[in-house]
Amino acid sequence: MISKDQLVNEGIRAREVRLIGQNGDQLGIKSRQEALEIAGRANLDLVLVAANAKPPVCRIMDYGKFRFEQQKKEKEARKNQKIINLKEVRLSPTIDEHDFNTKLRNAIKFLEKGDKVKASIRFKGRAITHKEIGQRVLDRFSEACAEVATVETKPKMDGRSMFLMLAPKNEKQ
């Protein structure tokens, strides 16, 4: 509703303003000076709410208290936002069973925390000629994570690496 660089009291340059009282009642069109006097008598501030209106709309309110309330609301909104991190699990085309299970456990732990997981395979030397081996490893990995994750991007090559993106399943599904 009101921006951070809000015009208050003497900062308002319009000659006439439509005045709204502190209870939300319309006080009519007043000169800027008269509106400032009314706000001053109530020990409150005159705040420009709608600058583009004809005439501009001003409201009588305690600006300090209003800013405090706005900051509190913004802080609460930021606190409720879930930050999703991207975790990477590196595999190799010739990964052993125990190593695969360890990487899988870590990936499942990340997914249960709500993070996305990027499973990547780096091909070294001539291993790049056998991309199907890496493809099978990533397919096996995505099938093993199927209970807690959905595949966001299918396995694809990027230079000498092949990667797969997994996102946590929603509770709704």
From Swiss-Prot:
Keyword Magnesium in annotation: no
GO molecular function: ribosome binding; translation initiation factor activity
Chief subcellular location: cytoplasm
Origin: domain of life: Bacteria
Compartments in which it is found: Cytoplasm
Keyword Cytoplasm: yes
Biological process annotations from GO: ribosome disassembly
Keywords recorded for this protein, A-Z: Cytoplasm, Initiation factor, Protein biosynthesis
Gene3D superfamilies from the UniProt entry: Translation initiation factor 3 (IF-3), C-terminal domain (3.30.110.10), Translation initiation factor 3 (IF-3), N-terminal domain (3.10.20.80)
GO cellular component: cytosol
Entry-linked Pfam families: IF3_C, IF3_N
Family, similarity comment: Belongs to the IF-3 family.
Function as written in the Swiss-Prot or TrEMBL entry: IF-3 binds to the 30S ribosomal subunit and shifts the equilibrium between 70S ribosomes and their 50S and 30S subunits in favor of the free subunits, thus enhancing the availability of 30S subunits on which protein synthesis initiation begins.
Subunit structure: Monomer.
Record's protein name: Translation initiation factor IF-3
Gene: infC
